[in-house]
Design a protein with these regions (language model features):
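Nucleotide-activated chemistry modules centered on ATP-dependent adenylation/adenylyltransferase
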Residues: 1-244
């Protein structure tokens, strides 16, 4: 591991300690996790820096299957809370037929609507449970919007009446995987499904009904590694067959 990587790890720990100071105690801090590649080092850093912490997962009706080993690993080390999905799978399918799939809508506005809904739901849970600081796994190099956010406000900022702390703000995907591998941490098996131009560094555990970026080959990847899920989505929306 390079000196730069180690410096970013220490910076992440410093941000976590700042979060506890702002919250007035670790009991008022919650780590929000998707159980994706960024969440693995995020949760491990939080527990090795702060001790047992509350990890909050906003469940989805269409999550990629197979992530149980990750959840079990962290549940054995801290408290895991699942916020149930707002819709069942059938309700989600009906809703998507009504509003259109993500790939059939204007991409950025559709993403903003989804992100805003998730943020509101997380903020409401925090308010209802005495949480003053949300720890998120966002990184600046993921999108131009996030890069601009961190450039303007830093990795710790106020939003929706809460303090948001982002320990991985300066990390790259190389940092994420270097940390996970060096610590011997488990990850979702989908990240081992490398092929068709996808690697661990650019794979994502977005739900299988999420079709943003479908033209980049995600649907073809789904067909190769998760054929049953590919069949389900293309039977529901036949026009997707031409995209993978």
């Amino acid at each position: 591991r390079t000196r730069g990587h180690l410096a970013r790890v220490e910076r992440a720990r410093s941000i976590l300690r700042t979060a506890v100071e702002i919250a007035g105690g670790v009991e008022a801090v919650a780590v929000f996790t998707s159980w994706g590649s960024d969440s693995v080092p995020l949760c491990d850093l939080a527990m090795t820096t702060l001790g047992p912490v509350t990890m909050v997962h906003m469940a989805s009706a269409y999550e990629m299957p197979g992530g149980e080993r990750v959840v079990e690993h962290f549940a054995a080390r801290g408290r895991v809370v699942d916020i149930p999905p707002s819709r069942t799978l059938d309700e989600t399918v009906a809703w998507l037929h009504d509003i259109g799939l993500g790939c059939d809508r204007e991409s950025e506005s559709a993403k903003k609507i989804t992100n805003r809904a998730k943020g509101d739901k997380g903020a409401q849970w925090a308010a209802d449970n005495g949480v003053a600081v949300q720890v998120l796994g966002m990184r600046a190099d993921e999108t131009l919007t996030r890069r601009a956010l961190f450039a303007a406000r830093g990795p710790v900022y106020r939003s929706r009446g809460l303090t948001i702390a982002c320990p991985l703000a300066s990390w790259s995907t190389v940092d994420v995987w270097a940390y996970a591998v060096s610590r011997g941490l488990p990850w979702h098996p989908l990240y081992d499904c490398e092929g068709l131009g996808f690697t661990r560094e650019n794979l994502s555990n977005i739900g299988w009904l999420t079709t943003h970026g479908v033209t980049s080959g995600r649907l073809a990847w789904l067909r190769r590694y998760y054929p049953d899920l590919h069949t389900r989505i293309t039977e529901e929306w036949p026009h997707l067959r031409g995209l993978g």
